Amino acid sequence: MGYYSDPTSSRDLLGNRTLLFIFVCAFAVVTLVQQILYGRNYYLRRYFEFYEGPLEFNSSKCLELRRGITDVKVLSMVKQTELFERWKNLQMCKWEINVTEANIFKSTLFRCCNAPAFLFTTQKNTPLGTKLKYEVDTSGIFHINQEVFRMFPKEMPYSRSQFKKCAVVGNGGILKNSRCGREIDSADFVFRCNLPPISEKYIVDVGVKTDIVTVNPSIITERFHKLEKWRKPFFNVLQNYENASVLLPAFYNTRNTDVSIRVRYALDDFESQQPVYFFHPQYLINLSRYWLNQGVRAKRISTGLILVTAALELCEEVHLFGFWAFPMNPSGIYITHHYYDNVKPRPGFHAMPSEIFNFLHMHSKGILRVHTDVCNCC
C-alpha cells in the first residue's frame, strides 16, 4: 500500500535548517563585532571581574591603561562613553606621583608664570606708582596709589613647594555623595572656588577646611549688592571659612576693581583678620597663554584651572576634587552641574571639557590626582 508524501515537508525541513544556520552565523557575527567594537576594554572588563584589589601604578597593565588616556591627543578623537570607560578602568590602578614628570611640569610653569612670585599683587612685584594693565581691558591702566598699595602684602605669602599635600576643590556635581570631606580636610592646604557652601548639609562630601577661597566680583554684585549698603551678610558668609585668605580678580577689568577693594574695607569694618589678596593680572595673562597652547580655547580659563595651576607650583602633591565637566559621571549616571545646585554656566565662556581632559592626562602621567570615585579616607 503506498503512502502519501507531502512534497512540502522536505522543503520545510530544509528551510528550518537554513534558518538555524543563518541564526548561528548571525550570532557569531554579532559576537565578533562586539569584540571588535569593545576591543581592549572588553578584555579589561573580563580581567577586572576576577581581580581583587588595586594594581600598581607602574605595572604593565596600568601603563597600558594610562596610555589609553594619554594616547588621546584631542578630546574629539573619542566618544564620551569611550573616554569614560577608559577612565573607569584606570581607577583600578593605585595612583602615585611621578616626581620626574611633576618637576618637569613645575619647571614649565616657573618659566611661563611663576606663581610663588606673581600669583598675587604684592608691594615687591607691584611698587607704588606702577601703571598696572588690566587683564582684559588691556587699554585700561590702574595707577597704584598709596591707598591700594597698603592693601598689598609686602611679598608673596607662599613659596615654591611649600605644602606637601594640597586639595583643590571644585564645585562639580561629581562631589555629591562622594564622602570625600575627610580626605579633603586631611590635606595640608585647601583651595576653594567662589564661596561654595560648606555647611553641615555638605560637609561629609566636601569637607570644611579652607585656606584660600576665591570670590568672583559678580557674586558680590548679584548676591550682596556691591557691598554698597549691607555688608554684614557678606561678612557672615566669609565666617564659614574661618581664617581663610580671600582672593579676588580685582584687576580683571575696571568694573572689578572698586568691588574688590570694598571687600577689603568690609572686612576692616568688622575687624576681621582674614587676609585679602588680588590676582596679579600679568600672571593671569601668562597663564591663559600657556593653557591656550595646551588646547584650552575659551574667553577665559576657569577659576578652578587657575587654582590648580598655582597649586602645582606651591605644593609637592596636588589632589583635585569636584572637577568634572560632563552631564554624566564616569558610570554614565546623570549628575547636577554643581554639588549644591544645577544652575548651568554661561555657554562658551569657559572650556571646561578641555580643562578636565588636560587634568585626566596629568593624572595619567602622575603629575596630579583627579578624584571622581567615592572616597575611602581615614
Q: Language-model features: where?
A:
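Metal-ion/cofactor- or nucleotide/acyl-coenzyme-handling active-site neighborhoods
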Residues: 2-378
